[in-house]
């Protein structure tokens, strides 16, 4: 019984992961969710701005909590692979595609890996300062 329950759980989890990779038809066109390496509002703005200029992309919305961008597009004008490649050219990972290093190097500091994990250095005050 326990093995069956475990098997069913793995199958459902695998199905959900696979479903995220497949385009879903919506009223405006097709929709796909792409995992990114975005970490802040500037990342969100950069990705959504750049995707707005990709031919065939109708809309995009990046959820920073999950680091997933949902893109609605016209399949006659673009495809998921082209959209992923566009994201990598901005400097971010897109599903299994690695970001372009030159683009990453030009990102603001807050958009780079570990930028939000680094504590702000404290400068010691000299005697008599700060009062």
Residue ranges with predicted function:
Residues 104-128:
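Short, low-order "capping/linker" segments at domain edges
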Residues 1-26:
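Bacterial Sec-dependent N-terminal signal peptides
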